[in-house]
Amino acid sequence: MANKDHAPEHYVTRILAEATLDGARPVVRWRDTVITGTQLDRSVRRVVTALREAGVARDHAVAVLTQVNSPWMLIVRYAAHLVGASVVYITGANHGIVTHELPVATRVRMLREAGASVLVFDESNAQLAETVDETVRDKLVLCGLGHPASGTVSVDGRPVDDVSVDFTPEAPELAMVLYTSGTTGQPKGVCRSFGSWNAAALRGAAYPRPVFLTMTAVSQTVAMIVDTVLAAGGSVLLRERFDPADFLRDVGEHRVTETFMGVAQLYAILGHPDARTADLSSLRHVLYLGCPASPERLREAAALLPGVLAQSYGSTEAGRITVLRAADHERPELLATVGRAVPGVTIAIRDPETGHDLPVGEIGEVVVHGPEVMAGYVADPEHTARVIRDGWVHTGDFGSVDERGYVRLFGRMREVVKVQDTRVSPTEVEKVLVGCPGVVDACVYGHRGPDLIEELHAAVVLGTEGAPSFDTLRDHVARAMTPTHAPIRFVRWRRFPINNTGKVNRLRVREVSAEARGDSPDVLVDR
């Protein structure tokens, strides 16, 4: 363990110090609940006491099962990090527009992989916690939570009344095991080191007293932004799901200064009829990410939100990689890029077959070296060795870097579709489709029919007025690219399912679209 006399500041002590400077100040809002600085401090300290009674020590792991984006998700993590433990969230709902609960078996797998011996749960998940406990081979210590505003905690049914006041904060080796969103497959557990998490949380906010709105789960990397805001003396507004009307109302009512969303959510806001009349004047920083955005839609977004947009490209494994800053959004030629490397990150483009670095402008795999690179996949050293080689994360993304350092992405390496001997990037086709008037969002993918010939299919969300026909969409793609790039089958969705990082759940879209028929209540099919 590092010498504590020379240890860096613990981000949770900074958060609690800022929260209690004015203990009556609201610091967390959730539903109709307001948590003040004093309440946050006392709740964290009471959970510290509970975790100690449960036998939690440095480098142990704590599993958390609460309602999505409940304040308890923050409180328990802060307490666990103070006693030197890591956290794994098994709440796991792919919330957003559509909610899909994780099976018990998946929750148990996540808990076991992380090595958690303590399960902390809220009242709404008490029965599920018992089911998980009965399913796990080794008996868990169960810590129950009351309403977030009450701060009540119990250990195996015994109420915890004491509030830890004097203690020395510990620093765990791992901060969290983050499970990837599983947009295309089974979620994987990514180990994030406490050192990199702590440094990121303490880097400071861009503006004093920020008010941050999150509509994506704080079980994911948005939690790092929440920590940065609270450590800077700001406040956070936690929402359980995304709705464009709610977003517009929240920004005006709570004078939100910063927010975080997926590209699909940004598109939904642009398409809302009240977007042009809502009061968005308080916004100073709108960070969006998840996939490359259509330049046409970004021009529309920049007109609605001038001077505040920033696009981030990153991954759970690599952390932040690039940023397209607000000033970059004023230059049309840069809107097809995802920006330049963030400070401390080095990007290389390598030949996927030879591993050699490629020259400027050539397309290859994006590989990354930086301070937020994961420690590895939990309980999977072989997969870790494939993804991290000599300290470089192999992202699996096709991309290129121009002479100024701007990165352009061309889709996932394994998602390239071969149509009539032509390699087609679904991401590039999606950008063209979303650039067509009347298209809100698009998801393009490969499909093999009975003859096993690969075809290009597309799922689209269309606007309520002036929606283009499927033939119009085919012609639009054929003119902008080639006829080979035009999808032969379209499925119209009312809205796409969104996972807990704000990305479109591509696997779900493909599965439902493949089974869809013309009489489906959710989709309209054309071929």
From Swiss-Prot:
What are the recorded GO MF terms, alphabetically?
Answer: 8-demethylnovobiocate synthase activity; acid-ammonia (or amide) ligase activity; ATP binding; CoA-ligase activity; metal ion binding
> Gene3D superfamilies, from UniProt?
3.30.300.30, N-terminal domain of ligase-like
Pathway it belongs to? Antibiotic biosynthesis; novobiocin biosynthesis
BP GO annotations: novobiocin biosynthetic process
Q: Which UniProt keywords are listed? A: Antibiotic biosynthesis, ATP-binding, Ligase, Magnesium, Manganese, Nucleotide-binding
Activity dependence on pH, as recorded: Optimum pH is 8.0.
Cofactor(s) of this protein: Mg(2+); Mn(2+)
Binding-site list for ATP = 180-188, 312-317, 397, 412, 503
* First-tier enzyme category under EC: ligase
Ranges in a coiled coil: none
Q: Which reactions is this enzyme annotated as catalysing?
A: 3-amino-4,7-dihydroxycoumarin + 3-dimethylallyl-4-hydroxybenzoate + ATP = 8-desmethylnovobiocic acid + AMP + diphosphate
- List its EC numbers: 6.3.1.15
Task: List all membrane-crossing ranges.
Answer: none
Quaternary structure per UniProt? Monomer.
Spell out the family assignment given in the record's similarity comment.
Belongs to the ATP-dependent AMP-binding enzyme family.
Query: Which purpose does this protein serve, as stated in its record?
Result: Catalyzes the formation of an amide bond between 3-dimethylallyl-4-hydroxybenzoate (ring A of novobiocin) and 3-amino-4,7-dihydroxycoumarin (ring B of novobiocin) in an ATP-dependent reaction in the novobiocin biosynthesis pathway. Novobiocin is an aminocoumarin family antibiotic that targets bacterial DNA gyrases.
Instruction: From the Swiss-Prot or TrEMBL record, give the protein name.
Output: 8-demethylnovobiocic acid synthase
* Phylogenetic classification of the source organism: Bacteria, Bacillati, Actinomycetota, Actinomycetes, Kitasatosporales
Q: Which gene encodes it?
A: novL
